[in-house]
Amino acid sequence: MKCNTLKLTEQDQFINKIKNSESQITSFYEYDAAKKESFYRRLKTPNNGREFHLSRVIKSYMNELKLTHQQLNNIDALADGAKVVIGGQQAGLFGGPLYTFHKIFSIITLSRQLSEEYDTPIVPVFWIAGEDHDFEEVNHTYAFNNKETTLKKVKYHTMTPPDSNVSRYTPDKNELKASLNHFFKEMKETVHTQDVYQMCVNIINQFDSWTDIFKGLIHEVFKDYGILFIDAQYPELRQMEKPLFKEILEKRNQIDQSFRETQIRKTQQQLPSMIQTETNTHLFIHEDGMRQLLNFDGTYFKLNKTEKRYTKQNLLDIIEREPERISNNVVTRPVVEEWLFNTVAFIGGPSEIKYWAELKDVFDTLNVEMPIVMPRLRITYLYARTKKLLKQYNLSIESVIANGVEQERQHFVREKASNNFINEVEEMKIQQQELYNNLFTYVENNHDNQLLLEKNNQIHLNQYDYLIKRYLLNIERENDISMRQFREISETLHPMGGLQERVWNPLQIMNDFGIDVFSPTTYPPLSYSFDHLIINP
């Protein structure tokens, strides 16, 4: 496998501005992610003293997995005070989109590079966002169907979707296997299909909760890199978080004010606000089988789905006795994560790093220093067949990844069409308009007849447009093979108008190139980059 760097012309320049250390962006973070001195300074910060306890919690969470010696060594290193590189993601169906794996690779790559450069152990940690309750975001994925050269949606179906955290949700294993069968039915069968399929079946059989099944998959793929996992909703972790939950509750007004004032400053810098929330408490509680947002009305903390209300003391008592019932929203989650870990760098997706830019003052309010915030690696897999098609149609990979192929496809069709035919039809439209302009002179004093002529004229003009459209459609049908190839290029490199990694599932890559395609022995060694990476499997 080979890896190359690609510089894309992107409409969104946020990451490029981080790369270029532009103050418009860097002023919203504690550290400049593009400067080497930031890492040196961050590594010198004292530890928080929670590392040993945290290592025991992580070991407990990963206890049902068969840990590799790399993972055991990293748990020991964490206990001894090693700092971490961390990032997280929701638990998507069958691993979710490729960018989940790419975030894990980002964490692994940066931790390895920092370990080597500073001659000190840096532990890679992946945070599973098990407290999330938006099941519609994680219950589906896509498979590329080669025969139809199109992506097919594959969904886990249930009549009773969870109202609470996905960590609390136990899916029906038969339905999950039915979704898995659907996924593999859409893909072409290869010499690797049975191995990948059986791996997934074994994981579904072994684990019960939605996030544990996800954990089992990413562990199987990434265990040899030594990466550690933790679920945000893990009860032992919630026990550790009790002091900070209480502080968040006590400082809710300052937190809310800090967050909203930063959003205003960000808007004044012509940067759009990312976080949309009406709560002033920034915590959820598990109540009546649902994850419900708390909001303070001046007297009581009320819920967004039921009529129940709490005093501050009620909530402090719940935090003390049942902290697993409390969870964070988008404003407080990053602070809790960094309060727990001695983090060198947080790895986020493009949207994540934007909303972190709204939270620096929230970190300061809770006396937690924001770590270095780094954009994750962005990766596209270029199949040999796709590369051949790009050459066949003289397409640049940079342009296709950024913009798709629709313009080039239309140009191809027009090249195959008769310009004389199209020009004649366009000339007929002009003559038609001239004729009706003359007719208008005879009815200029009759409004009803003017409307009649306008309507009739438009009908005829629409017919000429329809004639050209159907003519070009017939040209497309005559060149069906080329149209399928353009669609294949688009669905592979620019699916749904975006990046491959936002749509394609990692199991597709494993099915095509082997169950060990993401392993250290097969995957190309990566170097951290702000640019786009192209991997040729």
Curated annotation (Swiss-Prot):
GO terms assigned for molecular function: ligase activity
Source taxon at top rank: Bacteria
EC number(s) per entry: 6.-.-.-
Source species taxonomy: Bacteria, Bacillati, Bacillota, Bacilli, Bacillales
Name of encoding gene: bshC
Enzyme class per UniProt: ligase
Function of the molecule: Involved in bacillithiol (BSH) biosynthesis. May catalyze the last step of the pathway, the addition of cysteine to glucosamine malate (GlcN-Mal) to generate BSH.
Coiled-coil segments: 415-439
InterPro entries: Bacillithiol_biosynth_BshC, CC_BshC, Rossmann-like_BshC
UniProtKB keywords: Coiled coil, Ligase
UniProt similarity note: Belongs to the BshC family.
Organism expressing this protein natively: Staphylococcus epidermidis (strain ATCC 12228 / FDA PCI 1200)
Protein's name in the database: Putative cysteine ligase BshC
